[in-house]
């Protein structure tokens, strides 16, 4: 008997796929389309187990859908721009392009060795000119519409990577890649007006029926829509006003001070003549701007000489510069009510600012102790003049009416989300296609001159971008007036590239951004990736899709119908990482056990959404199962050569039992496939093989039927072995182009059933009975059974409880 030689099987199968262009996909309107996509990787150089799991999930889905008769698009590409490549290139004294292309070549060979069914004819590399040319073109269209703009902005500055970070890229006050403490800095930045789409992005979350609730909740919270009042506080002895937004106008009469951001114009003006304030502002620049950090870090402030007038009471109120107020949120100012806001209370305690209670509880029995903490619940207004006695709802309306009539405020809908800062001050990115002219201002590059190519002959350093030091890149003629001008040296945030790549896969060689194929394939039917992308990539991609729709490039509203967020791969309870020394190299596993074993383990060890705990024993178990599958084929290959057909009238009792088990497991596998519960699909395969091995006298036709069902269920998981055995057993040419098995409902109709017999609730017997018996007949047969009679002779049968074809309980006394 031949041994399971996974190496030869996998090489020959992969060669077959290559020769036959098995995975190449074309538009076919006669078939239902299915677009299956896993998030494209950054070409780091080698695959890790997280990659293996993520892309195996996608491959299993793609292969299953293909066997369902659908026209499946399953592409792959590379998120190739960004700081890691630039930093690696500096370290290894190579160009980022060389470094990236070398990594791609190796990782692609690893993908192929795992048997992934990618259509490589659609491969995209985001650092290629043919790709980024079209995002430059798209940016220009957005600029012409007023959806892209440039302004001075206080940004999160990473002093190590020498670039700006979006708020989402600051983790615990540190840069998400470098780990450096982030600083605040004001520089010119390019932005996209994602706020123009905030309402639609929020509302359309309701369309995402097949997205995890956790991701939808994260996006809802990030967009952060809230309704409230903008209140105007007049600066004393000045014509200026400070506007603040509040969702709690019922607390307006309890305002004890205003807090303004360290970068607020009034703060900066006073700092010119106040060195202590200037020093405080400098200190604030070194603190985190992330909301999570602001909530936990020490509250610090500096009392200014600025006073404002309360819009209702006309009281004079102090203005403090506070480290927890952000210039990028609203107007950079907040009204502070220490009695009814815990953060304001903590600040007031530190600086001995008095409290004024203006809300009391609806519950008269509740004692409010402002010495211990703020009272933050809604209730009844007190100490609020004409508004005393009002509840929140009525107070909101009354105060809104007063402020509006007095021109001292207005109702506002506010969003937590802010426009997306897309400028990065590094080299290895897509050049922003803008030119700065002293006379004309910012001018887009002429479309016929696109792409604006990234220079390749550059001297890379760790101190920012070298583009500003390349005269032939910077010095250009203004596209409008022809006078000498300067090219923009910022590059796009790499999330710009990954926000539309899924659409370009549909037409990767089109001489336009997208063509008609985009509307055939989009939206993506199944998107697979980590939940860590919930509020960056997934939100930006939704935004881009709506921008492309409004540009007439796509017809759908949303990019991804169904989202699967896979869990992490853990070892010893921790995420695999070099720093923890718990990395498992997939290539070593492939060399030792074969790609099919690695794939099978990664799908069987846990449901896709849950974390997978690495286990060498689990890998060995997966390999052992595949050897059993191979050995069964070897032992029975003579049978398959006979071309036997199943004849139901000739089936034995054992055949029928086996077919019931096989088709029951097939039915469960189909259900679990559609739910993406792949671990239980693999379990069904194991049960089918056990059935085939456990019955000694199965008909050859049942063996052939059962094993062909097993191979087709297993094929999406272990494509090499199943392809090989399918051909070896003369079942067909290519299992991938074979229809997925269907359940024979006749096989699920039992001739007999096993009945559990209880007497007074205790198990006494198990009887095999004819399935055609009625309830009365079952009762007669059971009561007449000699073994049962031995328990009930000379006893009174009080009643008989029968659960059809499962259990009968005889109550006696």
From Swiss-Prot:
Taxonomy, superkingdom: Bacteria
Location(s), subcellular: Cytoplasm
Keyword Membrane: no
Top class in the EC scheme: ligase
Reactions catalysed: tRNA(Leu) + L-leucine + ATP = L-leucyl-tRNA(Leu) + AMP + diphosphate
InterPro entries: aa-tRNA-synth_I_CS, aa-tRNA-synth_Ia, Leu-tRNA-ligase, Leu_tRNA-synth_edit, M/V/L/I-tRNA-synth_anticd-bd, Methionyl/Leucyl_tRNA_Synth, Rossmann-like_a/b/a_fold, tRNAsynth_Ia_anticodon-bd
Pfam families: Anticodon_1 (PF08264), tRNA-synt_1 (PF00133), tRNA-synt_1_2 (PF13603), tRNA-synt_1g (PF09334)
GO molecular function: aminoacyl-tRNA deacylase activity; ATP binding; leucine-tRNA ligase activity
UniProt binding sites for ATP: 578
A cellular component annotation (GO) from this entry: cytosol
Annotated EC: 6.1.1.4
Residue ranges annotated as motif 'KMSKS' region: 575-579
Keywords annotated in UniProt: Aminoacyl-tRNA synthetase, ATP-binding, Cytoplasm, Ligase, Nucleotide-binding, Protein biosynthesis
Locus of motif 'HIGH' region: 41-51
PROSITE patterns: AA_TRNA_LIGASE_I
Family: Belongs to the class-I aminoacyl-tRNA synthetase family.
UniProt protein name: Leucine--tRNA ligase
């Amino acid at each position: 008997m031949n041994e399971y030689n996974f190496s030869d099987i996998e090489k020959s199968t992969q060669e077959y796929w290559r020769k036959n262009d098995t995975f190449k996909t074309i538009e076919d309107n006669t078939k239902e389309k299915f677009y299956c996509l896993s998030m494209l990787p950054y070409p780091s150089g080698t695959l890790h187990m997280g990659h293996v799991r993520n892309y195996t999930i996608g491959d299993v889905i793609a292969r299953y859908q293909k066997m369902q008769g659908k026209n499946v698009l399953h592409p792959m590409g590379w998120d190739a721009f960004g700081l890691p490549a630039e930093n690696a290139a500096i370290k290894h004294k190579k160009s980022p392009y060389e470094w990236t292309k070398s990594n791609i070549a190796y990782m692609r060979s690893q993908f192929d060795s795992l048997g992934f069914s990618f259509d490589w004819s659609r491969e995209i590399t985001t650092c290629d000119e043919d790709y980024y040319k079209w995002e430059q073109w798209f940016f220009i269209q957005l600029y012409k519409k007023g959806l892209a703009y440039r302004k001075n902005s206080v940004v999160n500055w990473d002093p190590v990577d020498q670039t700006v970070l979006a708020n989402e890229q600051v983790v615990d006050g540190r840069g998400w890649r470098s780990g450096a403490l982030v600083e605040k800095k004001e520089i010119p930045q390019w932005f996209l007006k994602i706020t123009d789409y905030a309402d639609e992005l929020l509302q359309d979350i309701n369309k995402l029926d097949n997205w995890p609730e956790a991701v939808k909740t994260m996006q809802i919270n990030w967009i952060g829509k809230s309704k409230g009042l903008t209140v105007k506080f007049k600066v004393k002895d000045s014509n200026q006003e400070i506007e603040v937004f509040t969702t709690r106008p019922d607390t307006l009469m309890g305002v004890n001070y205003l807090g303004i951001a360290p970068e607020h114009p009034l703060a900066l003006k006073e700092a010119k003549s106040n060195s202590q304030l200037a020093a405080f502002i400098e200190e604030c620049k070194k603190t985190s701007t992330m909301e999570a950090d602001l909530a936990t870090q020490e509250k610090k402030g500096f009392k200014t000489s600025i006073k404002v007038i309360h819009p209702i009471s006309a009281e004079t109120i102090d203005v403090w510069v506070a480290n927890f107020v952000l210039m990028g949120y609203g107007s950079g100012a907040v009204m502070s009510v220490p009695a009814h806001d815990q953060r304001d209370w903590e600040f007031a305690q530190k600086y001995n600012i008095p409290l004024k209670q203006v809300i009391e509880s609806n519950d008269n029995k509740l004692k409010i102790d402002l010495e211990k903490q703020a009272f933050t619940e809604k209730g009844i207004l007190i100490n609020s003049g004409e508004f005393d006695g009002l509840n929140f709802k009525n107070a909101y309306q009354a105060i809104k009416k007063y402020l509006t009539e007095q021109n001292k405020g207005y109702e506002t809908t506010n969003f937590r989300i802010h426009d997306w800062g897309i400028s990065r001050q590094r080299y290895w990115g897509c050049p922003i296609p803008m030119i700065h002219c002293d006379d004309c201002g910012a001018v887009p590059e002429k479309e016929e001159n696109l792409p604006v190519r990234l220079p390749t002959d550059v001297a890379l350093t760790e101190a920012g971008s070298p583009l500003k030091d390349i005269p032939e890149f910077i010095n250009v003629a203004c596209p409008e007036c022809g006078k000498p001008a300067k090219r923009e040296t910022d590059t796009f945030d790499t999330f710009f590239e990954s926000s539309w790549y899924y659409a370009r896969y549909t037409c990767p060689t089109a001489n336009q951004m997208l063509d008609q194929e985009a509307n055939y394939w989009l939206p993506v039917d199944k998107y697979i990736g980590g939940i860590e992308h919930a509020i960056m990539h997934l939100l930006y991609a939704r935004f881009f899709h709506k921008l492309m729709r409004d540009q007439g490039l796509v017809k759908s509203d949303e990019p991804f119908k169904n989202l699967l967020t896979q869990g992490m791969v853990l070892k010893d309870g921790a995420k695999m990482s070099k720093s923890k020394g718990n990395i498992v190299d997939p290539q070593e596993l492939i060399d030792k056990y074969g790609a099919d074993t690695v794939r099978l383990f990664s799908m069987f060890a846990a449901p896709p959404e849950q974390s997978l705990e690495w286990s060498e024993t689990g890998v060995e178990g997966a390999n052992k199962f595949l050897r059993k599958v191979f050995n069964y084929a070897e032992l029975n290959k003579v049978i398959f050569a006979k071309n036997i057909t199943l004849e139901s009238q000739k089936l034995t009792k054992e055949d029928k039992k086996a077919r019931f088990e096989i088709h029951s497991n097939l039915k469960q596998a189909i259900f679990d496939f559609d739910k993406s519960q792949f671990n239980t699909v693999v379990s069904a395969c194991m049960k089918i093989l056990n059935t085939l091995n456990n019955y000694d006298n199965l008909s050859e036709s049942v063996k052939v039927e059962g094993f062909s069902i097993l191979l087709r269920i297993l094929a999406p998981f272990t494509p090499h072995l199943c392809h090989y055995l399918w051909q070896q057993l003369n079942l067909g040419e290519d299992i991938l182009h074979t229809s997925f098995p269907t359940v024979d409902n006749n096989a699920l109709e039992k001739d007999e059933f096993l009945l559990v017999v209880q007497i007074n609730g205790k198990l006494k017997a198990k009887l095999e009975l004819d399935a055609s018996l009625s309830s009365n007949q079952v009762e007669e047969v059971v009561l007449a059974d000699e073994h049962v009679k031995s328990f009930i002779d000379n006893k009174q049968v009080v009643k008989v409880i029968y659960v059809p074809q499962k259990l009968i309980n005889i109550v006696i006394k």
